[in-house]
C-alpha cells in the first residue's frame, strides 16, 4: 500500500478545499493510505513543508494541491513557477515522487473551479503510480530479457 501525504495551500481556499476533498476520495479509490495532510498558507510555502515530509519514513509519495489565480500583475507567474521548480528539486533530491496538482498560473477563478477535480485526481494518481513503479523498479532483476515496469 502506498503511503501518501498531501500538501494543500490555503490561499484560494474555496478552490483548494474542494481539491483536497477530491484528492482524498481518489486516494481511497486507489487503495493508498493517507499518512499526512498538511496545509500551508500558500503555494509558495509548499516546498518548505515538503522537505520535512519526504524525510519521514511513513511517506512514500506526496501530492501537492493549490490554485494560483491570475491577477493584475505577474505575481501569479512568479509564485507558480518558483514553487514548481522547488517542488521538482525536492523530489529529485529526496528520491520520493512529488506531484504537481497546482492550478495556474494564468488561470482565472472560473477556470480554476473547472479544473478542481482533474488536477486533484491527476496529482494523486501520479503520486501513487510513481511510488508503486519506484518500488517495482527497486525490486526488479534483469535476467536477460527486458524488464517492463507499469
Curated annotation (Swiss-Prot):
Catalytic activity line of the entry: (2S)-2-hydroxy-3-oxobutyl phosphate + 5-amino-6-(D-ribitylamino)uracil = 6,7-dimethyl-8-(1-D-ribityl)lumazine + phosphate + 2 H2O + H(+)
InterPro entries tied to this protein: LS, LS/RS, LS/RS_sf
EC id: 2.5.1.78
SUPFAM superfamilies: Lumazine synthase
Pathway assignment: Cofactor biosynthesis; riboflavin biosynthesis; riboflavin from 2-hydroxy-3-oxobutyl phosphate and 5-amino-6-(D-ribitylamino)uracil: step 1/2
Gene3D superfamilies: Lumazine/riboflavin synthase
Keywords: Riboflavin biosynthesis, Transferase
Protein family per UniProt: Belongs to the DMRL synthase family.
Known role: Catalyzes the formation of 6,7-dimethyl-8-ribityllumazine by condensation of 5-amino-6-(D-ribitylamino)uracil with 3,4-dihydroxy-2-butanone 4-phosphate. This is the penultimate step in the biosynthesis of riboflavin.
Name this protein carries in UniProt: 6,7-dimethyl-8-ribityllumazine synthase
Amino acid at each position: 500500500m502506498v503511503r501518501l501525504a498531501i500538501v494543500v495551500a490555503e490561499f484560494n481556499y474555496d478552490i483548494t478545499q474542494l481539491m483536497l476533498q477530491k484528492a482524498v476520495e481518489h486516494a481511497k479509490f486507489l487503495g493508498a493510505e493517507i499518512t499526512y495532510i498538511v496545509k500551508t498558507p500558500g503555494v509558495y510555502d509548499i516546498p518548505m513543508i515538503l522537505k520535512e515530509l519526504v524525510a519521514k519514513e511513513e511517506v512514500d509519495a506526496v501530492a501537492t494541491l493549490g490554485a494560483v489565480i491570475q491577477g493584475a500583475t505577474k505575481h501569479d507567474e512568479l509564485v507558480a513557477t518558483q514553487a514548481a521548480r522547488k517542488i521538482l528539486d525536492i523530489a529529485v533530491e529526496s528520491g520520493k515522487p512529488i506531484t504537481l496538482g497546482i492550478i495556474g498560473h494564468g488561470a482565472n477563478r472560473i477556470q480554476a473551479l473547472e479544473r478542481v477535480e482533474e488536477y486533484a485526481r491527476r496529482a494523486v494518481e501520479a503520486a501513487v503510480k510513481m511510488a508503486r513503479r519506484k518500488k517495482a523498479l527497486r525490486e526488479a532483476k534483469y535476467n536477460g530479457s527486458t524488464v517492463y515496469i507499469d
